[in-house]
UniProtKB/Swiss-Prot annotation:
Signal sequence bounds: 1-22
UniProt note on tissues of expression: Expressed by the skin glands.
Name of this chain's protein: Rugosin-LK1
GO biological process, one term: defense response to Gram-positive bacterium
Keyword annotations of the record: Amphibian defense peptide, Antibiotic, Antimicrobial, Cleavage on pair of basic residues, Fungicide, Secreted, Signal
Propeptide section residues: 23-40
Domain of life: Eukaryota
Localization: Secreted
Stated family: Belongs to the frog skin active peptide (FSAP) family. Brevinin subfamily.
Keyword Secreted applies: yes
């Protein structure tokens, strides 16, 4: 009987420790969800920069076409 109690106590102890480790990992994972990595920030900045450059190019092209049209009086 004593051996059975001892082994059950040991199993309870191991289960408690493993549960504690799982809770620590879970709380660490929850903390990281809201943070963006530096690579993600850089990627977003690069996409915005590329979109702004493309927008400026297309706007500049439109202005130049309108200017050429007005100068040639072909509009």
């Amino acid at each position: 009987m004593f051996t059975m109690k001892k082994s059950l106590l040991f199993l309870f102890f191991l289960g408690t420790i493993s549960l504690s480790f799982c809770e620590e990992e879970r709380s660490a994972d929850e903390d990281d969800e809201g943070e963006m990595t530096e690579e993600e920030k850089r990627s977003i900045r690069d996409k915005i920069k590329t979109m702004a450059i493309d927008l400026a190019k297309s706007a500049g092209t439109g202005v130049l076409k309108t200017l050429i049209c007005k100068l040639d009086k072909s509009c």
